[in-house]
């Protein structure tokens, strides 16, 4: 604001007063009108409240004017332009401008955007997860359905006569031990030793190559059998050959000894029933009842 003119300075009628120019920050639209230089005697008293030459604080308060009807009329408040703060959307031309209103709206929007607080990124989560949660080991669901009754013991069928197990594993006969030798090419057993010791393997080879295709298997495997075909021819050939190879006469006694050894070994090693003419079985008692060896009801 321009300092007010001191009252003590004398003014002459011929003095010419120039209206002070606005600040360099005044809008360009206000400077478009030419300034008129007036003499001091032509100045009116309505300019006493000029904001540019008088102090607004020293001006006396203007009371409300009264109209003819007696109702008080409020005096319009003079618009004062702040020299320090100048808004670019205020128009000094006095005509409405659409450009000024649009720029004012955009300026207000930018002002609100700057005044708004910055968004908080982690507002939803109070703190970041730094420790991986431990995996919960759940037991797999049993989709097989309800568990059935426990399996019965395979040795629960007992013979009524001897009280031994009647299952196939326990009741099957036990054979003499045997093994394969010479890179799994030769079977070493009691019966094989008898065949090679009495030269019966030579007779089996002759029967394998000289008999018909239908009978070669039975004659070669069982050369001394009386129920096979060509029984007389086989026995006649073995009798004539025993004159040259007398060891063939030891074949039958040696085979009998193997049968006896097989029966004795089976009696010692077979844990199950050896009864031949009985089919009656009984059910084994429960595992918890150790004293009861036989149930009351056979079937």
Curated annotation (Swiss-Prot):
GO biological process: animal organ development; negative regulation of ERK1 and ERK2 cascade; negative regulation of fibroblast growth factor receptor signaling pathway; negative regulation of Ras protein signal transduction; negative regulation of substrate adhesion-dependent cell spreading
Domain (SPR): residue spans on this chain: 166-273
PROSITE patterns found in the cross-reference section: SPR (PS51227)
Keyword Plastid (UniProt): no
GO MF, one annotated term: protein kinase inhibitor activity
Keywords noted in UniProt: Acetylation, Cell membrane, Cell projection, Cytoplasm, Developmental protein, Membrane, Phosphoprotein
Positions of region (Disordered): 50-79, 92-127
Intracellular or extracellular location(s): Cytoplasm; Cell projection, Ruffle membrane
Pfam family of the protein (one): Sprouty
Location of N-acetylmethionine modifications: 1
Biased composition (Low complexity): 92-107
Sequence positions bearing Phosphoserine: 125
Membrane topology: Peripheral membrane protein
Gene Ontology cellular-component terms listed: cytoplasm; cytosol; ruffle membrane
Protein's UniProt keywords contain Cell inner membrane: no
UniProt xrefs under PANTHER family: PROTEIN SPROUTY HOMOLOG 4, SPROUTY
Subunit organization: Interacts (via C-terminus) with TESK1 (via both C- and N-termini); the interaction inhibits TESK1 kinase activity. Interacts with RAF1. Interacts with CAV1 (via C-terminus).
Family to which this protein belongs: Belongs to the sprouty family.
Function of the protein: Suppresses the insulin receptor and EGFR-transduced MAPK signaling pathway, but does not inhibit MAPK activation by a constitutively active mutant Ras. Probably impairs the formation of GTP-Ras. Inhibits Ras-independent, but not Ras-dependent, activation of RAF1. Represses integrin-mediated cell spreading via inhibition of TESK1-mediated phosphorylation of cofilin.
Domain text: The Cys-rich domain is responsible for the localization of the protein to the membrane ruffles.
Name of the protein: Protein sprouty homolog 4
């Amino acid at each position: 604001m321009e300092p007010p003119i001191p009252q003590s300075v004398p003014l002459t009628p011929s003095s010419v007063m120039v209206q002070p120019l606005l600040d360099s920050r005044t809008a360009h639209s206000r400077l478009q009108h030419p300034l008129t230089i007036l003499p001091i005697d032509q100045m009116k008293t309505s300019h006493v409240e000029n904001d540019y030459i008088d102090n607004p604080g020293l001006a006396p308060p203007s009371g409300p004017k009264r109209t003819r009807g007696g109702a008080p009329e409020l005096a319009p408040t003079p618009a004062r332009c702040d020299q320090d703060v100048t808004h670019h959307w205020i128009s000094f031309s006095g005509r409405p401008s659409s450009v000024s209103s649009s720029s004012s709206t955009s300026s207000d929007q930018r002002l609100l955007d700057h005044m708004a607080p910055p968004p908080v990124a982690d507002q939803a989560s109070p703190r970041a997860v730094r420790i991986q949660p431990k995996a919960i080991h759940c037991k797999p669901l049993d989709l097989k359905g309800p568990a059935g009754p426990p399996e019965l013991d395979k040795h629960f069928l007992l013979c009524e006569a001897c009280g031994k197990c009647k299952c196939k594993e326990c009741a099957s006969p036990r054979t003499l031990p045997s093994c394969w030798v010479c890179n799994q090419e030769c079977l070493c057993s009691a019966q094989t030793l008898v065949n090679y010791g009495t030269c019966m393997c030579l007779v089996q080879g002759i029967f394998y190559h000289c008999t018909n295709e239908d009978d070669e298997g039975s004659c070669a495997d069982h050369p001394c059998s009386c129920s096979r075909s060509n029984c007389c021819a086989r026995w006649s050939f073995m009798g004539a050959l025993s004159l040259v190879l007398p060891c063939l006469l030891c074949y039958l006694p040696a085979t009998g000894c193997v049968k006896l050894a097989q029966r004795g070994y089976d009696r010692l090693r077979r844990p199950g029933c050896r009864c031949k003419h009985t089919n009656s079985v009984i059910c084994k008692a429960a595992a918890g009842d150790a004293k009861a060896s036989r149930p009351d009801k056979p079937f």
